Amino acid sequence: MSTLKMMLLILLLLLPMATFDSDGQAIPGGGIPSAVNSRVGGDEKSGRSLEKRCRSGKTCPRVGPDVCCERSDCFCKLVPARPFWRYRCICL
C-alpha cells in the first residue's frame, strides 16, 4: 500500500474519535454562524422581511442576499454576468 493510501486509512479510522468528547458525548455542530445567516436571522427575529425593507416591495432571488428592484412593475430575468448567470431586475 502506498504511503498516501495508508495515511488516508489512518485518518478515516481516527475521524469518529474526533467527533466525540472525552465523556462519549457528541460535540454539537453549528459553531459561529456566517455573517449572511446572522443578518437574515436578525431580520427574521425582528419581524422585518426583505419585501418590507425594499421600497418597491419587489425582489429578485440570487445567490446570497436578494436584490431589491427599483419599482414594483419590474420583473426578474436570468442574465449572463461573468462568470455566472444572475437574476436582474428588468424595468420597462
Swiss-Prot record:
The protein's UniProt keywords, in alphabetical order, are: Cleavage on pair of basic residues, Disulfide bond, Secreted, Signal, Toxin
Q: Which domain of life is it from?
A: Eukaryota
Primary localization:
secreted
Known post-translational modifications? Answer: Contains 4 disulfide bonds.
Q: Where in the cell is it found?
A: Secreted
Propeptide stretches are 21-53
- State the residue spans of region: Disordered: 30-49
Please list the GO terms describing molecular function. Answer: toxin activity
Keyword Disulfide bond set for record: yes
Its GO CC terms are:
extracellular region
Q: In which tissues is it expressed?
A: Expressed by the venom duct.
Asked if the keyword Disulfide bond belongs to this entry, the reply reads yes
Q: According to the UniProt entry, where is the signal peptide?
A: 1-20
Q: Which family does it belong to?
A: Belongs to the conotoxin N superfamily.
Entry's free-text remark on domains: The cysteine framework is XV (C-C-CC-C-C-C-C).
Its name, as the record gives it, is: Conotoxin Mr15.2
